């Protein structure tokens, strides 16, 4: 349990010493539950899938991301809060800076995460030069799933692995404080992590990353239509809530609820 606000300096100091823990959240309620139990809370555009029922993340808007980030910031006072910049909000350096400043002015997010390839290096540089804390997201990038033809594992061979390493190093030199690595072969995840002085957080990128993150509804069994290989379920949350709602409905129908102690 964190007893004070997590910082970039503390996250960087954990590299090679203690694994970084991270989870997603999209509202104040879940943020309060997770706050201080993990180092990082990510307000991911994955909310369009796990929260909005869609099959991709591309529909997330700036307005939605700001709304959910504000909610999470109200609920979490100790964990480090990172917000995703949605698809289309950082196509050019000027657009990226305008939208990043909008995030910073309208939320209490500690940092922003961008899904980027090496072509977006100018975007990353502009944000870092303006004092905006940036995490670069490399490997499998859900915002580009249409371009890639689906969710495809990266870093499968030496060429892909080396390209990811070179991109990660370039982003480090541009000023990012960390790298999120998604959906890459474990060996590539390890090589990227070893090549960097800044921490890496993995999701489906192997145990050698400096930290791990999962989508909360995957980790706690609220989404069971599909389970990626990298997900471990820590409880069957869907079944727990199903039992609870059925018990509630049964009590209402049988007039077992409310009773005298629950009435004015």
Swiss-Prot record:
Recorded GO MF terms: 3-methyl-2-oxobutanoate hydroxymethyltransferase activity; magnesium ion binding
Keywords (A to Z) from UniProt: Cytoplasm, Magnesium, Metal-binding, Pantothenate biosynthesis, Transferase
GO cellular component terms listed in the entry, alphabetical order: cytoplasm
Pathway given in the UniProt record: Cofactor biosynthesis; (R)-pantothenate biosynthesis; (R)-pantoate from 3-methyl-2-oxobutanoate: step 1/2
Catalytic activity entry: 3-methyl-2-oxobutanoate + (6R)-5,10-methylene-5,6,7,8-tetrahydrofolate + H2O = 2-dehydropantoate + (6S)-5,6,7,8-tetrahydrofolate
EC number from the UniProt entry: 2.1.2.11
Location of this chain's protein in the cell: Cytoplasm
Enzymatic class: transferase
Binding site for Mg(2+): 45, 84, 115
Residues noted as binding 3-methyl-2-oxobutanoate in the record, renumbered to the chain: 45-46, 84, 113
Alphabetical list of Gene3D superfamilies matching this protein: Phosphoenolpyruvate-binding domains
Any one Gene Ontology BP term: pantothenate biosynthetic process
Cofactors required: Mg(2+)
Active-site residues from the entry: 182 (proton acceptor)
InterPro entries: Pantoate_hydroxy_MeTrfase, Pyrv/PenolPyrv_kinase-like_dom, Pyrv_kinase-like_dom_sf
Entries under Pfam families matching the protein: Pantoate_transf
Binding note for cofactor: Binds 1 Mg(2+) ion per subunit.
Subunit structure as annotated in this protein's UniProt entry: Homodecamer; pentamer of dimers.
Biological role: Catalyzes the reversible reaction in which hydroxymethyl group from 5,10-methylenetetrahydrofolate is transferred onto alpha-ketoisovalerate to form ketopantoate.
Assigned protein family: Belongs to the PanB family.
Classification via NCBIfam families: panB (TIGR00222), PRK00311.1 (NF001452)
Name used for this protein in its record: 3-methyl-2-oxobutanoate hydroxymethyltransferase
Provenance organism: Helicobacter hepaticus (strain ATCC 51449 / 3B1)
Name of the encoding gene: panB
